[in-house]
């Protein structure tokens, strides 16, 4: 039961961060490209790499994994919004933006997981 509370706490924090980041990015760049979703996915991927690597080199408590890995990062990142925004770009005929959104999300997020892991592993 404790882990459920940690997931809920982390999820509420992650959801608020996602909302604030998305609003900030729309104010900064407009809404022609989903920069907010891209940024939260990049941040979340980096942090997931850090959490994973920390778990490989030391003991990460189940509560921290629930709070950060499942709750915070689960609510911060969003595959469903990425998918919907990409489909909307395709439906509006913005094929290049849709392809760019797919490529950036996949490539940058995988790279950020790697970068997060390497940051931890290089400090050992």
Curated annotation (Swiss-Prot):
Stretches that traverse the bilayer: 4-24, 35-55, 70-90, 95-115
Membrane-protein topology: Multi-pass membrane protein
Record-listed Na(+) binding positions: 74, 77
Segment forming the signal sequence: none
Keywords annotated in UniProt: Cell inner membrane, Cell membrane, Ion channel, Ion transport, Membrane, Metal-binding, Sodium, Transmembrane, Transmembrane helix, Transport
PANTHER family, per database record: FLUORIDE EXPORT PROTEIN 1-RELATED
Catalysed reactions, as listed in the record: fluoride(in) = fluoride(out)
GO molecular function: fluoride channel activity; metal ion binding
GO BP term (any one): cellular detoxification of fluoride
CC annotations in GO: plasma membrane
Family membership: Belongs to the fluoride channel Fluc/FEX (TC 1.A.43) family.
UniProt name for this protein: Fluoride-specific ion channel FluC
């Amino acid at each position: 039961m404790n882990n459920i509370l940690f997931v809920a706490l982390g999820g509420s924090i992650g959801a608020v961060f996602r909302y604030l980041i998305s609003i900030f990015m729309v104010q900064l760049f407009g809404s022609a490209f989903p920069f907010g979703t891209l940024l939260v996915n990049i941040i979340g991927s980096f942090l997931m790499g850090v959490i994973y690597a920390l778990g490989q080199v030391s003991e990460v408590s189940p509560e921290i994994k629930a709070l950060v890995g499942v709750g915070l990062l689960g609510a911060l990142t969003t595959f469903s919004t990425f998918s919907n925004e990409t489909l909307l770009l395709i439906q509006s005929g913005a094929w290049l933006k849709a392809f760019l959104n797919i490529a950036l999300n996949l490539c940058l997020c995988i790279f950020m997981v790697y970068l997060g892991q390497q940051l931890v592993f290089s400090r050992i």
